[in-house]
Amino acid sequence: MTTKKAYMYVLECADKTLYTGYTTDLKKRLATHNAGKGAKYTRYRLPVSLLYYEVFDSKEAAMSAEALFKKRKTRSQKLAYIATHQKEKKNH
């Protein structure tokens, strides 16, 4: 039995705001957002682009990561987290 990967992702909207979510199919979810069928928040801020994502072994882990990420209230706090974690990915 294989476990399905899950993703916590961050989108940058056309108005430069950030949207955070989780999914088990990142490519499909991004397409859904850009088709105007995703979250209400992104529907009116199209197009959106994938800014960052993390891979997890379960949906629950991705949901937890999303909740923790959303505790960062300011854009600068969120971008600092992304910058730090992207550097860590490159160093592995």
Curated annotation (Swiss-Prot):
Database matches in Pfam families: GIY-YIG (PF01541)
CDD domains: GIY-YIG_UPF0213
Tree of life domain: Bacteria
Residue ranges annotated for the GIY-YIG domain, each copy included: 4-80
InterPro entries: GIY-YIG_endonuc (IPR000305), GIY-YIG_endonuc_sf (IPR035901), UPF0213_domain (IPR050190)
Family as reported in the entry's similarity comment: Belongs to the UPF0213 family.
Protein name: UPF0213 protein SpyM50708
Species assigned in the record: Streptococcus pyogenes serotype M5 (strain Manfredo)
